[in-house]
From Swiss-Prot:
Name this polypeptide is given: Bifunctional glucose-6-phosphate 1-dehydrogenase/6-phosphogluconolactonase
Organism: Plasmodium falciparum (isolate 3D7)
Family assignment from sequence similarity: In the N-terminal section; belongs to the glucosamine/galactosamine-6-phosphate isomerase family. 6-phosphogluconolactonase subfamily.
Region (Disordered): 689-711
GO biological processes: glucose 6-phosphate metabolic process; glucose metabolic process; pentose-phosphate shunt; pentose-phosphate shunt, oxidative branch
Active site annotation, chain numbering: H640 (proton acceptor)
Keyword Lyase attached: no
The gene coding this protein: GluPho
Entry-linked Gene3D superfamilies: 3.40.50.1360, Dihydrodipicolinate Reductase, domain 2, NAD(P)-binding Rossmann-like Domain
C-alpha cells in the first residue's frame, strides 16, 4: 500500500456517535492502514503544534507490533523523527529484557526511527521497587506534560474484560486498593470519594498520572499504567481492534453502555465521551435530522481501526438507529420498557408452585420493571378469578419470609401482582387460537403503553405523578373517564413533543416479552410455530424459556433442537436446568476459582475420586405417567448431575461472562466418553416390609409403596428409579479419576451433595487412615466442610474430624433466592451463564444415549431395593472399588442455610 491508496480508503471513514471507524479487509490491510493512519496523524500534528513536537503514547500487547513494524517502512509521509516524544502507556512489572516486557517487544520501533531514548522516550524503571517505580514514573510523566503541555496521540487496544492499557475493571477499586489503601503509594487522605466504587464520579478524585494495578487474568499480575484522565486528554485516541472477538467486545461495550454508562467497568467509553473537541470543527448548517449529520457538530478524536467484519459500522449504526435498540441489546433496566411474561401451561403444577411464586417474589423485591404484564395461557376453561385463587395459596407462602412487613403492605402487594396478571384460554396446536391471542395480547399491551404515555406527558407539565408508582392504584384502567380526561388536559400540544397527536407519531416505548413454555416437549414446536406465525413481537424482543426434558436420547434431542431453532435463534433460547439457579450451585465457580488451596488441588495428582449423590425420599406415586417413559437417568443424571460435574471440574475461564463459562463446560463434556453398562447398576424400589410411617405425612409419594402401585405405571415396567454409574474425564487434569454418580427415588434421605475425596498420603502404613474429603451439600441444606485427620489428645492415635466451612450466622440470609426466582431474573437481564446451551445438551445426550439404548435393547431388569433404604446392596461393592467409605459420616454443621424456600420437585410438568 502507498499513501495515495490510503487516502482513498480514508475517505470511507464513518463517524458514528463521536467515534471514527476505519474498516479494513484483512490483517495485512489492517496493519498497513493502521500504520499509515498513525503516521498521517503524526504528520498533521507536527504541522500545527508549536515547535513541531508530537507526544505519542504506546500501549502493549501483540496487536500493535506488526503495525509498528509497518510504520518503520513508510517513506512517503515525511515526519521529523527528532521531534517525536514517546511514552509507554502501560508496562508489566518485569525487567526491560523480559519476554513479557512491553518495552522489550516494541524497542525495535525506537531503533528503526533513530529515537534517542534518553531524550525522546519516557518509560518506567522496573529495576526499582514497585512503589519507587510508580512514584518515579509519575514524576517523569508530570515533567513530560509540563514540558510539552499535552498528549497528542494514544494508541490503545481492548482486553477481554474491557480493560484498556492496564486499567482493569473495576478501575477505581483496583487503583484504590493498590495505591491509596494504607497510603501504600499515594496519600489516602487526598481521596474524598463517594462510598460506592461503581460510581463514575469517583474517577475525578484519581489525579495522579501513573498507577499500580493488578490482574489475575494474565501471566504478569503486577502492572504500571498511566491514568484514565491522561488518556482521555489525548488529542487523538486510536483503538486497534484486529479480530472479530475484539470487535464483538467493542459492540458489546456500546450496548451495555447505551442506557447508563459505567466508566469503571468500560473505560473506553470515558475516552469516547471526552472525544468531542472544537478542533477542526466542521459544522453542518442544514437542519437535516439525519443521524450522521447530528454527530458531525464537532470533531471526534477517537478512532477505531477494525478488522474481522464487513460493514462493521452498519452493525454499530443499528444499535442507535433502531427504535427498539435500547431494549434489544441492553442488560440494564429500561425505564421506557413494558415487560410481558407469557406462561404457556399456566394451569400446571410447575407454573402454580414455581413460576408464579418466583415472579411474585421478584415483584415484591422490585427486581422487575414497574410496567409489567403476566399472561397465563392454558387449555383449561376457567375465569381469571378461579385461576388466581388456585395460585394465591403459593403466593401467600412467599410472604412468610417478609416478617417485618405489615399485613396491609402484603395485601397491597398481592393486589398489585393480581392486577398485573391475566388469563387466556387457548389451544397450543390451533393457529386460530393464536390469532385471537395476538389480538388480546396487543390490545392489553397497547393499553399499558398508553398508561405510560399519558403519565409521561403528565410529567412534562411539572407533575411527578406516575400511574404505576402506587401498587394500591394498579387497578386504575386507562378507560377510567375522569383519569383519562385529566391526562388529556395535561397533554396539550404546548406541553407535549412535536407532532405528538399526529397519526404517524410513534411513542418510543419498547415492549419485551419472555415466553415460558411450562409444557411437555412434544408441545414445544407447535406452540413456537403458532406464536411465531401469529404473535411475533415487532416492538422488542422475544425470549424463550424451555423446561426439560429436551428429548429422551441423542436423536430425539437433535430433532427437537432443529425444530426449535427453525423458529427462534439460539440467542433467544433459555433452556432451564433449575439446579443452575440454586444459590449454592451458582457459587461453585467462585468457590473453586477464588480459593487457592482448592484450585491448586483440583486435579488427578491429588484427587482420588469425585462422588455426586442426589437422593430423594419421595417415590413417584402420583407422577408415574411422567416418570415412567424417562426414568432416573434421564430425569436427573443427564442434566442436573452432569451440570454439577462440569462446574467443579472445568478449567479457569478467561472471565466469568456467559460465553467463556459455556466454552469451558463444553470442553469438559467433550472429554467424557460414553458410559459403559459394566460400570452401571440400576434399581427399582419395592414396598418395604418394616417401614415406619410418619403419622403427620400426607404426601402419598413419601408413604411406603412399590413403584408399580402407581395406576399409570405398567406392572411389567422395568424403568429404573435408581442408578449408580462411573464416568471418566479424559483430560490432562482429570485422566483416570473416577466420577461416581448415584441417584434414586424412595431412598433413606433427601440430599444432594458433592464429595471430593483426596488420595491418601503416599507410603502411609496406617490402615485406619481415612481419606481427606471436601464435601459440598447443596440440599436440603447448604453446607461445606472438610474431613481431615488429627492426632487424638493424650495418645498417638489418629482420629477423623470435620472442619466446618459453612456460612456463619453473620452471613445468614433468611430469604435465599429460590432457583426459579434467580433464573427468571437472569433471563430478564439477558444473562445466559445459568442456562444450558444447545451444544452442552448435545454432549450430555452423547454421553448417556449408548447406555440407555443398551439397557433398552437388552431389557436389563433393575435390581430391587426396599422403599426407604439406601438402594440396592450391590451398589456398595461397585462404589467401594473407587471410594473409601471410612467411618459413618453423619456430621452436620450447627448452622445450615435452607437451600430453597419451596419444596424442590419438578416432576409434574403439565
Amino acid at each position: 500500500m502507498d499513501y495515495e491508496n490510503f487516502v482513498k480508503s480514508a475517505e470511507e471513514i464513518n463517524n458514528l456517535h463521536n467515534v471514527n471507524y476505519l474498516e479494513t479487509k484483512d490483517l495485512n490491510d489492517f496493519n498497513w492502514k493502521a500504520a499509515y493512519y498513525i503516521c498521517k496523524e503524526i504528520y498533521d500534528k507536527q504541522q500545527i503544534n508549536k515547535d513541531g513536537y508530537v507526544v505519542i503514547g504506546l500501549s502493549g500487547g501483540r496487536t500493535p507490533i506488526d503495525v509498528y513494524k509497518n510504520m518503520c517502512l513508510i517513506k512517503d509521509i515525511k515526519i521529523d523523527k527528532s521531534k517525536l516524544i514517546f511514552f509507554i502507556i502501560d508496562e508489566r512489572y518485569k525487567s526491560d529484557d523480559h519476554k513479557f516486557s512491553n518495552y522489550n517487544n516494541i524497542k525495535f520501533l525506537f531503533h528503526n526511527l533513530n529515537i534517542n531514548e534518553k531524550e525522546q522516550l519516557y518509560k518506567p524503571d522496573t529495576t526499582k521497587s514497585i512503589v519507587d517505580c510508580i512514584l518515579d514514573y509519575n514524576d517523569k510523566i508530570k515533567i513530560m506534560i509540563e514540558k510539552y503541555k499535552k498528549v497528542d496521540i494514544a494508541i490503545l487496544g481492548m482486553g477481554s474484560d474491557f480493560h484498556i492499557a492496564s486499567l482493569f475493571p473495576n478501575i477505581f477499586y483496583n487503583i484504590y486498593m493498590n495505591n491509596y489503601q494504607n497510603n501504600y503509594i499515594y496519600n489516602e487522605k487526598t481521596l474524598d470519594f463517594i462510598n460506592n466504587d461503581q460510581d463514575n464520579d469517583n474517577l475525578k478524585y484519581l489525579k495522579e498520572y501513573v498507577y499500580f494495578t493488578t490482574t489475575n487474568q494474565f501471566d504478569v499480575r503486577k502492572r504500571i499504567t498511566v491514568s484514565l484522565n491522561l488518556l482521555a486528554n489525548a488529542s487523538s485516541k486510536i483503538f486497534l481492534l484486529n479480530s472479530k472477538d475484539k470487535l464483538d467486545l467493542w459492540k458489546n461495550m456500546l450496548i451495555k453502555s447505551y442506557i447508563e454508562v459505567n466508566y469503571n467497568l468500560y473505560p473506553a467509553t470515558y475516552l469516547i465521551d471526552t472525544s468531542c473537541t472544537n478542533e477542526n470543527v466542521n459544522i453542518n448548517n442544514n437542519n437535516n435530522n439525519n443521524n450522521k449529520n447530528k454527530n458531525n457538530y464537532c470533531y471526534s478524536n477517537t478512532t477505531v481501526i477494525s478488522c474481522g467484519y464487513e460493514n462493521y459500522t452498519k452493525s454499530i449504526e443499528e444499535i442507535y438507529d433502531s427504535k427498539y435498540a435500547l431494549s434489544l441489546y441492553s442488560n440494564s433496566l429500561n425505564k421506557e420498557e413494558l415487560l410481558t411474561i407469557i406462561i404457556f401451561g399456566c394451569s400446571g403444577d410447575l407454573a402454580k408452585k414455581k413460576i408464579y411464586p418466583a415472579l411474585f417474589k421478584l415483584f415484591c423485591n422490585n427486581s422487575l420493571p414497574k410496567d409489567l404484564l403476566i399472561i397465563g395461557f392454558a387449555r383449561t376453561v376457567q375465569d381469571f378469578d378461579t385461576f388466581f385463587d388456585k395460585i394465591v395459596i403459593y403466593l401467600k407462602r412467599c410472604l412468610l419470609c417478609y416478617e417485618d412487613w405489615s399485613i396491609s403492605k402484603k395485601k397491597d402487594l398481592l393486589n398489585g401482582f393480581k392486577n398485573r396478571c391475566r388469563y387466556f384460554v387457548g389451544n397450543y396446536s390451533s393457529s386460530e387460537s393464536f390469532e385471537n391471542f395476538n389480538k388480546y395480547l396487543t390490545t392489553i399491551e397497547e393499553e399499558e403503553a398508553k398508561k405510560k404515555y399519558y403519565a409521561t406527558c403528565y410529567k412534562m407539565n411539572g407533575s411527578d405523578y406516575n400511574i404505576s408508582n402506587n401498587v394500591a392504584e394498579d387497578n386504575i384502567s386507562i378507560d377510567d373517564e375522569n383519569k383519562t380526561n385529566e391526562y388529556f388536559q395535561m397533554c396539550t400540544p404546548k406541553n407535549c413533543p412535536d407532532n405528538v397527536f399526529s397519526s404517524n407519531y410513534n411513542f418510543p416505548y419498547v415492549i419485551n416479552r419472555m415466553l415460558y413454555l411450562a409444557l411437555p416437549p412434544h408441545i414445544f414446536v407447535s406452540t413456537l410455530k403458532n406464536y411465531k406465525k401469529n404473535c411475533l413481537n415487532s416492538k422488542g424482543t422475544d425470549k424463550i424459556l424451555l423446561e426439560k426434558p429436551f428429548g429422551n436420547d441423542l436423536d430425539s434431542f437433535k430433532m427437537l433442537s432443529k425444530q426449535i431453532l427453525e423458529n427462534f435463534n439460539e440467542q433467544q433460547i433459555y433452556r432451564i436446568d433449575h439446579y443452575l439457579g440454586k444459590d449454592m450451585v451458582s457459587g461453585l465457580l467462585k468457590l473453586k476459582f477464588t480459593n487457592t488451596f482448592l484450585l491448586s488441588l483440583m486435579n488427578r495428582h491429588f484427587i482420588k475420586c469425585i462422588k455426586i449423590t442426589l437422593k430423594e425420599t419421595k417415590g413417584v406415586y402420583g407422577r408415574g405417567q411422567y416418570f415412567d417413559p424417562y426414568g432416573i437417568i434421564r430425569d436427573v443424571m443427564q442434566n442436573h448431575m452432569l451440570q454439577l460435574l462440569t462446574l467443579i471440574t472445568m478449567e479457569d475461564p478467561i472471565d466469568l461472562n456467559d460465553e467463556s463459562v459455556k466454552n469451558e463446560k463444553i470442553k469438559i463434556l467433550k472429554s467424557i466418553p460414553s458410559i459403559k453398562l459394566e460400570d452401571t447398576i440400576i434399581g427399582q424400589y419395592e414396598k418395604a416390609e418394616n417401614f415406619k410411617e410418619d403419622e403427620n405425612n400426607d404426601d402419598e409419594s413419601k408413604k411406603n409403596h412399590s413403584y408399580h402401585d402407581d395406576p399409570h405405571i405398567d406392572k411389567n415396567s422395568i424403568t429404573p428409579t435408581f442408578c449408580t454409574c462411573i464416568l471418566y474425564i479424559n483430560s490432562i487434569n482429570w485422566y483416570g479419576v473416577p466420577i461416581i454418580f448415584k441417584s434414586g427415588k424412595g431412598l433413606n434421605k433427601d440430599i444432594c451433595e458433592i464429595r471430593i475425596q483426596f488420595h491418601n498420603i503416599m507410603g502411609s502404613s496406617d490402615e485406619n487412615m481415612n481419606n481427606n474429603e471436601f464435601v459440598i451439600i447443596l440440599q436440603p441444606v447448604e453446607a461445606i466442610y472438610l474431613k481431615m485427620m488429627i492426632k487424638k489428645t493424650g495418645c498417638e492415635e489418629m482420629e477423623e474430624v470435620q472442619l466446618n466451612l459453612t456460612v456463619n450466622e453473620k452471613n445468614k440470609k433468611i430469604n435465599v433466592p429460590e432457583a426459579y426466582e434467580t433464573l427468571l431474573l437472569e433471563c430478564f437481564k439477558g444473562h445466559k451463564k445459568k442456562f444450558i446451551s444447545d451444544e452442552e445438551l448435545y454432549e450430555s445426550w452423547r454421553i448417556f444415549t449408548p447406555l440407555l439404548k443398551e439397557l433398552q435393547e437388552k431389557q436389563v431388569k433393575p435390581l430391587k431395593y426396599s422403599f426407604g433404604s439406601s438402594g440396592p446392596k450391590e451398589v456398595f461393592g461397585l462404589v467401594k472399588k473407587y471410594y473409601n467409605y471410612g467411618k459413618n459420616y453423619t456430621h452436620r454443621p450447627e448452622f445450615v442455610r435452607k437451600s430453597s424456600f419451596y419444596e424442590d420437585d419438578l416432576l409434574d410438568i403439565n
